[in-house]
Amino acid sequence: MDSFLPILNAIDSFLWGVPLITLLVGTGILLTIRLSLIQVVHLPRALGLILRAKNKGAGDISSFKALCVALAATIGTGNIVGVATAVKVGGPGAIFWMWMAAFFGMATKYAEGLLAVKYRTTDEHGEIAGGPMYYIRRGMGEKYRPLAGFFAVATVLVAFFGIGTFPQVNAIVDSVELSFGVSRVVTDIALTVLIAAITIGGLRSIAEVAARIIPFMAVLYIVICVGIILMHIGEIPAALALILDSAFTGTAAAGGFAGSTVMMAMQNGIARGVFSNESGLGSAPIAAAAAKTKEPAEQGLISMTGTFIDTIIICSMTGLVLVLTGAWHGDTAGAAMTGAAFTSLYGSIGGMLLTVSLALFAFTTILGWNYYGERAVLYLAGVRAILPYRLVFIALIACGAFLKLEAIWVLADIVNGLMAIPNLIALIALSGIVVHETRHYLEKVRRGAWMRR
């Protein structure tokens, strides 16, 4: 398969170049305008709903747990390795464009969450089933059934061969071996047993674990980064100025940094931002559909906070640490670059802290994508296919530490991009429904506030 690598790389570069990025950002801009800057005006309400949502109505898990499952899949190696790669190639200006992708992506994520709840249904066991394949088919009509099926097939392929397995497994075993000297085989066996024990229990088991790990790992990583930022607090204005200046003028070569143009900063920042927060890819609404709620718009608001937490907070922390410590123009790249920034304050312990963060991020990503793939299999083949899917997924985790097939990873990137296309078509086609539901919900909120006066 590696003989096809040049062809696959060319397709990957084209797909994740101007066409898809334009469609992703364009959809976010369209929804931002039609929803009257919902990600700004109603962000405080959205953040408040995370912990005080009513959790009444149809659904399998609470709104908070649904958000944690989505964040489990979203917060991954991209928050560490992806940001470092974007800054290494595109310069500090890539961070600004990452923010822009997240800003417009919040409106996209809101629409995904709303539609997921509005068009969800129940499976043969009475459990909730929802996501893009359902709002494409039920919202756009039966004639778009092939588009829904295409999305579901792409989701299964990404869960099996892309984000959900090999890259995450390799990130865990590599980092644990490097920092703690634990054999890859031992780590892989332990990881496989853990994943099997959790995923065999289905959504409720995954949601329970995610609800415990996600807050802990997010706070841990933020605290580590804040420690470094505080040590350079006087340099923050200069760092922000560098980020803004580089976003519009490019960055000259410095040290191990080869220099970048405005287009390089824009393309890498937006692409890595989208990879990290998954706004528009259609993955998060699969989890959102399972939330206990009567209000589609309310779950949309909660879903929107996922992009805010993932990119505006966590990715920004990584980016600021890289710029403030000067690690971005060193000779390292990827996780090693972030590791250099961590060790600048914490010494050798910094490398261990990074390993723990990376392992937790990758572990929860596996859990989240296991669920996404399972829901896609359910749509394609029904309940009878779920157990075989889980067994294959666990087998791939067991093999993941020993497979380094670059062509498969590039193919997974391509399929990941192809996931987004039917989802974005649906978001644009159903944007009128999103606007109508939003106005109806906000009117009820205003009436409720008026009646309480």
Label the predicted regions.
Residues 37-63, 85-87, 91-95, 99, ...:
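Flexible loop linkers connecting adjacent transmembrane helices
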Residues 3-4, 34-39, 78-83, 159-173, ...:
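Transmembrane helix-loop junctions in multi-pass membrane proteins
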Residues 27, 31-32, 104-126, 133, ...:
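Helix-loop-helix module between adjacent transmembrane segments
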